[in-house]
Amino acid sequence: MRTARLVINPAFAVGPVRRRTFGSFVEHLGRCVYTGIYEPGHANADDDGFRTDVLDLTRELGVSTVRYPGGNFVSGYRWEDGVGPVEKRPHRLDLAWHSSDPNTFGTDEFMRWAVKAGIEPMMAVNLGTRGVQEALDLLEYCNVPGVSHLAEQRRANGVDEPYRVRMWCLGNEMDGPWQIGHKTPAEYARVAAETARAMRMIDPGLELVVCGSSSRAMPTFGEWERQVLTETWEHVDMVSAHAYYWEQDAGLQEFLVSAEDMDRFIDQVSATADAVGAAIKSDKVIGISFDEWNVWYQDRTPSRPPTGDDWPVAPRLLEDNYSVADAVVVGNLLISLLRHTDRVWSASQAQLVNVIAPIMAEPDGPTWKQTIFHPFALTSAHAKGDVLRVVIDGPTIASQEFGEVQAVDAVATWADDEGTVFLVNRHENETVQVEIDVPAGCRLVEAVTLTSDDPRWQASAEDDTTVAPRANDTAVLDGTRLTADLPAISWTMLRLAR
């Protein structure tokens, strides 16, 4: 068995663990909203029509923020359709996903759900088919406490106090040709800058996210960020990044090192933002909102929207069923986000329920946990204090795209007298033993590993417990030397205290 050596020291702090790293995403797409978080008439629905079983799992997952209402959906959305008396709301076509929306769930319903879920709302405005005025109207409806027309409309709809939403996304994936209202970098930069400037006239304390690239593979990546940030620099706080990964023709081993791409993506966006700041002699730091990320098998049938005259409400779309290998990759992506906590200020796993999601909810039926639920929930629960830089020296994997990369990847966090190490063994065949130098006086509190002899195993409504994190009995702490065996294709959490 080969060995990887790691050093953990509370002095090697990268930055604070940000609770916003553990965000999620609710879009009017497939069954995420309707028969997902919202299903009036379900046995577990509360008086607002919210599924309490989904709410319970959302809290167990440890979600901190939720981005709403999209996604591609937002670029054709008229927010006014989703407020006011439900019986008067229009039924609209959703061009993004070739579906239709009855608008029985809208802004006020989402805000009520957010309170019950204990999450911070992150709103997106439509800069595809709409612009500055419509964004200002939504902001006024949500945040203004006075006697303005839209504040009064909110009160008439039963909400006296403003929602005071802090984080706002200025559109969605405007670099993508698939986006309704797709724009060039110059076109988008101009409308984003004007929208941001005007929104701050209403509420100077907003945290605004400008659209970055939809993936590192986009042909405009880099140049898009440069042009957009040059125009919007003084008006925004963060730039978005989106990335999805799935096993492709290169095979399982290449898929298992997907986090190498996320690392490079974050580093390159950071470098581009810093270069823009240097060019204009600004000391301001632009953060990254990695507000769409996950494993998503985009080449599979569930990802294909309806066609022709079929415009269903809440069709089954993007309902990927995740394997153990997928869960290991998700755990590794969380490691990447954490170790870049100095630049990643917010993140949203896409999405929360039913649609490429950790939570599944059957119509008129039960909920169940996908494999990817576990690394997210445990990382959210136990990543506290500061993120520590981890030095790794161990066996490597020959990646087709990234060259030689470490088989074991890891990050650690430390808060007061307790620390946690999150690790993945990305080798598809070999167990690797880790030897970790830890601070003196520690004791081992918990060691759990998620793995399976069958890395293709998937959970279902009938069985979501056969494969879950289990105690790793190989973990031993002897003085300042912590050892543990990491099976091939596994995710592990080691908790320490002193």
Residues covered by each model-derived region:
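Non-catalytic accessory regions flanking glycosidase/transglycosidase catalytic cores in CAZymes
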Residues: M1-W224, L229-M238, M262-D263, D267-T301, ...
